[in-house]
């Protein structure tokens, strides 16, 4: 069985803007993906509202995606695929991030995935990465 980690922000979390809570479990895209894949893979949703690629948010601590990625990958290994859905929150005015800054944040996460995931796999290969 394959392991897929979906690492993202509120879209991965399943945030429902209509009520400020989460969509029901059955309505979240990660659950729908799991149902489509059936027993061929396990889908692990790792979403957090407001998560950034690598920016510290003084208004919402704990949202730096680079900080949590390391323990996340170690706790879920071995991982076959990481679906990376981050960058939208980097556009917040308070970060004053340029497209280059956001790209560097994504690049940092990709390098972390390529560095950490082979340590948890018997074949020593990096997990595949799907950047959304």
Predicted regions and their residues:
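Alpha-helical cap/lid subdomain in secreted, periplasmic
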Residues: 62-132
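Catalytic metal-binding/acid-base residues of hydrolase active sites
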Residues: 11-12, 49, 89, 107
């Amino acid at each position: 069985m394959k392991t897929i980690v979906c690492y993202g922000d509120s879209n991965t979390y399943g945030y429902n803007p209509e009520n400020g809570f989460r969509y029901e479990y059955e309505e979240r895209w990660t659950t729908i993906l799991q149902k489509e894949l059936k027993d061929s893979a396990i889908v692990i949703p790792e979403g957090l509202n407001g998560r950034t690629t690598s920016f510290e948010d003084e208004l919402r601590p704990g949202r730096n995606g680079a900080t949590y990625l390391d323990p996340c990958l170690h706790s879920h290994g071995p991982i076959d695929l990481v679906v990376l859905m981050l960058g939208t929150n980097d556009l917040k005015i308070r970060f004053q991030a340029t497209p280059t800054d956001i790209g560097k944040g994504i690049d940092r996460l990709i390098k972390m995935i390529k560095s950490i995931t082979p340590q948890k796999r018997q074949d020593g290969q990096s997990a595949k990465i799907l950047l959304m």
